Amino acid sequence: MEAKAEGFCSFLVGLSGAPVNSKELKSALEKGDMKARASALEALIRMHLNGEPQNHMIMTVIKFITPLDDHYIKKLVLYFWEVVDKTDASGKLLSEMILICSFLREDLLHPNEYIRGLALRFMCKVKERELVEPLVSSVVQNLTHRVTYVRRNAVLAVHRIFKRFPELLPDAAELVEKFISEENDVSASRNAFEMLVECSPDRVVKFLAELRESKNLESLGATLQMSIVDFAGHMIRANPYDKGRYVTVLFSILQSNNPAVRYQCASTLLSISTSPTAIRQAALTFIDLLKTHTDISVRLIVVDQLDAMRERFSKILQDSLLDILSVLANGTMEIRKRIVTLGVELVSNQNSEVFVQAIKKELYWVKNECDVDDKESLLEYKKLLIRATRTAVARRPHMASAVIPLVLEYLYEEDDSGFEVVSLIREVLQLQPSLRSETLRQLRQTLRMIRCPSVIRTVLWLLGTHVTSADDALEVIRLLINTLEPLPLEPTVKEQMKQQEDFDGHKGGQQKPRMQMTTIVQEDGTYVMSSVPSNKTQEDAEGNDSNCGLRGVLTGGKFFIAAPLASTLSKLIIRLFNHHSSGVDESTMKEAQNSAIMLLNEVLRFCTMDGAAGMIDDATHEQIRLALLNITNPRSPLLATFVEDSSKALDSLTNKVGSIAGGDGFDFNKRNNDNVVGRTSFDEQQVALCSVDTPVMFTQIMEGKGSLLELEAVDDLGSVVANASIEKTEEFLIKLEKTVPLSGFCDPLYCEASVTVHQFDITVDWYIANCTANVLRDVSIELTPLGSMKLCERPQVHTIQPHGSVRIRTALKVGSPETGVICASVLYEGPQNERGCVVLNNVRVDIMNYVRPAKCSASEFRDKWCKYDWENAVAIRTEKTDMREYVEYVMQGTNTRLLEPYPEEDDEVVSAFDGKGDNGHRYVSCNMYARTLFGDDALLNVSIERDAEGKLSGMVRVRANKRPVAYGFGEKLNILNRRIVS
């Protein structure tokens, strides 16, 4: 069957009950009551739509049904005239159809406005000139009818008639222009406006100018305003030099009361103008919608729009940061998270104080919020706030003094919030020497109450690294001793009870009650000591035990904390003896030295005793022994030089490769620059860098693509057109690269396909060319998708002329991001009605088509790495020798992004990274991150080293929250490795 034959069947309507013959229908139409005649008309319409022509019933309908005044009958009659064939095989109008003109004229001038409206809507669908011509005057008369329903449909009828037969209504534009200037109904005005837009744009421009002068644009109806916005955007794209005429119109419509109109108007301004005023107005409109609208989906869409604006107009949005953050007061948890994430990207010198104040307010809200059911979401939001505070402090250092007292109270918590806070404090101590003294004092005050082992470890390292004065060093030593008192160290009550239970269980006896010594007064007044069973619970006993903070962590069996404790004590004692010996009494230094030795000996004894909660590892044991040795001989010049050089090395590392370690979005290289703005886009940074020997381009004397790009850079009016042209060319080239040939030119049919992946479906564009000199009929594609893909609908059947071609598009639903295969073949019918088949190559849908590079901070990466269970490890053994080249090869092959970018400027760091420098670095470890279109995460860790032969080997580990993602990435990595070998 040819494709043209299917064009006549628009839809199929099911018939219920027994089939009806023509005699019964004719009898019902002639002699039945209103209900019977209506049922007969409905049956006629259904039968004709389903492929049973009913032209032989036209005269019966004209004679017996058309004169009736029943409204429902009138409606069905018009439906019948719409679907019935009104022309013969040669295309001439049937003689019977001339008879309905008088009835249509009566309906167009009927006293009842409903019937008039039905007739006018029918006139919109008539395509026969002979029927339309005698009714034009009747249609035009309805433009001045008193009822808006009639006028609304009359404008539509005039529009359709003028579009099909402009010679029948040459003054249609003038009539509609007069109509729209006098019309008060919004829908009728909108229909008239759409007609003028299509038929006479100049009159639309005149109409808009009159509206702009009368200042009535903001008071128009929402539907008409939406049409005006679409027209303005279309005209500006067609002729950018008239932009000023329409931007003022859009500014007026921005004051509309309808949120949909305001959103569309703001989006149009963003797409057609780069003026700061227009962008600022669009941003303020989005922010106002974010504040006033209650629908969650709409607010999320607006936040996404603002985030898209940030990539191009970051500096303009920075001025509106206060308005954006005000949405936090009445937002849901998801809205709050997105607003904070957006606000972090907009922090600058001018607005960082506003941002920090908003974060303070939100932290207080999180602390006092008890009614939230989703505690996990609240915890994630708290971590996000603290991470945002870190970013703000890194970009506005002088705000740290106000922020640190606020976040210090979160050091006490055992979740990840404490680690985020101590990371912030670490950066402040390293980058802002003026705040070290006060910050270290606050740390010393809070050390006793910290319970998280990782936080305690970092705090100890900070105290050992940044405490330099003699008084502070002595105070820290006393603090550490007091924190671990009372001595000697003993296991916690919980550990003692556990050991007792294990011992009693091993003996098989019943557990003895806990005994307590008490004093009893006898009858003669004497005092005696007696042991009685204790009724205290385990919790009470633990509450009385000194197991808080550092002591509790150490006695609880986490012996790794002893290593940073020993390192801190040794650093403090070495500094005390080498740099402050002249200002401190010898007895005081000796006392501090003895106290440190005594404390470490006690820690070492406790960690190696038989009743300890666990076993100390060899590395920690060795570090404690080494610290004792260093404290015993603290005046060694080697130790003093080592401590000082380690501090200098830390400063040097921060200055050189701070940008590499800035996975959380910090730029340490710019910490002293007063012009630091928030994290700008990569394009902006590239524009700022310009070599002194770059040639100057003169637009007037250049040709080709270079001149176009220069015009794009300096000419604001042509930027939209130039960008659109370049983007379309790039999209075409990308699509061309994805096109895969599936058959050869020697086959009767040549076929090629390109796959486009969307979020939940796949679109395959097929190109089929007839390589023969014969007409091939019934050409169709048979598809068999494998995997999670399902075919939405069967492809249509086509007829291809000799050496002709056809394009077919098919859609497949996708359930999960995994590699799939589409098996296909092309069936056709030759000139002698013989059936043929061309088996095509398989179309592979790679999992990488679903993957997009994404951003992720280092802390988020660690959290996800610990949380996700699905892991796939791929061993590496390659002939490549360049580490950076291999990392980039993996990154491009897996569509991932490095968490920590390469250093580009420092040759020493680069050579260290590549392992070609004198320092002999021969290994690389880096993390990569990506997200699928389904929202699934993919985390990669690449660890490689260079062996003695110069070849690279190592491991790539993949973790994901879904099994298909981890499996697919592992398969892709194996393919990449095989390509290198081959």
From Swiss-Prot:
Gene Ontology MF terms: structural molecule activity
Top-level lineage group: Eukaryota
Keywords: Cytoplasm, Cytoplasmic vesicle, ER-Golgi transport, Golgi apparatus, Membrane, Protein transport, Repeat, Transport
Subcellular location: Cytoplasm; Golgi apparatus membrane; Cytoplasmic vesicle, COPI-coated vesicle membrane
GO CC annotations, alphabetized: COPI vesicle coat; Golgi membrane
Ranges for the HEAT repeats: 16-53, 130-167, 241-278, 317-352
UniProt cross-references to Pfam families, sorted A to Z: Adaptin_N (PF01602), Coatamer_beta_C (PF07718), Coatomer_b_Cpla (PF14806)
InterPro entries linked to this entry: ARM-like, ARM-type_fold, Clathrin/coatomer_adapt-like_N, Coatomer_bsu_C, COPB1, COPB1_appendage_platform_dom
Membrane topology classification: Peripheral membrane protein
Keyword RNA-binding recorded: no
Entry annotated with the keyword Membrane: yes
GO terms of biological process kind: endoplasmic reticulum to Golgi vesicle-mediated transport; intra-Golgi vesicle-mediated transport; intracellular protein transport
Role summary: The coatomer is a cytosolic protein complex that binds to dilysine motifs and reversibly associates with Golgi non-clathrin-coated vesicles, which further mediate biosynthetic protein transport from the ER, via the Golgi up to the trans Golgi network. Coatomer complex is required for budding from Golgi membranes, and is essential for the retrograde Golgi-to-ER transport of dilysine-tagged proteins.
Subunit description: Oligomeric complex that consists of at least the alpha, beta, beta', gamma, delta, epsilon and zeta subunits.
PANTHER family for this protein: COATOMER SUBUNIT BETA
Name of the protein in its database record: Coatomer subunit beta
Source species: Trypanosoma brucei brucei
